[in-house]
Amino acid sequence: MGIKLAHAMGAHVVAFTTTESKRNAARALGADDVVVSRNDDEMAAHVKSFDFILNTVAAPHNLDAFTTLLKRDGTMTLVGAPATPHPSPEVFNLIFRRRSIAGSMIGGIPETQEMLDFCAEHGIVADIELIRGDEINEAWERMVKGDVKYRFVIDSATLAG
């Protein structure tokens, strides 16, 4: 949703992915550019180029790889909450370039309503995979394996009443 929202707001959107196979999907969502974060050359091409990075990864990872991409006074905001902590970032990289790491949760009711209104106005919808109630265990296993493209939504009509 972040890619779709930023694109609709007119931002130049650069998406990061760990695999080449997701490049086309990110472009289809509205990304102007896609960087494979495991490709050192692609990452190096963006050093000191971003004012803001929205980091949605919910697994521990090296934050330094992304904070080095921030311009002076840039901010990376974390919205993914990993089960175990991220490795500690390199402090001098933050201090000397006045870079910041921030966190954010979902907004309150007014912010959520504003976002929903914006989505309705711009025809933005969530990409989901609809599953039946009897597929919940399979969906869980797929999630554990990382074999998930979009959020699962359970079709409530398939649940035993």
Model-identified regions with their sequence ranges:
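C-terminal hydrophobic helical "lid"/dimerization subdomain
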Residues: 8, 109-161
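Short glycine-rich anion-binding loops that position phosphate/pyrophosphate groups of nucleotides
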Residues: 59-60, 82-84, 159
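Adenosine-nucleotide cofactor-binding segment
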Residues: 7-65
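Helix-to-beta-strand junctions that scaffold the AdoMet/dcAdoMet cofactor pocket
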Residues: 70-72
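Glycine-centered, small-residue-biased loops immediately flanking beta-strands
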Residues: 74-75, 99
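Hydrophobic residues within alpha-helices
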Residues: 2-5
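Rossmann-fold NAD(P)-binding glycine/threonine-rich loop
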Residues: 80-98, 109-117
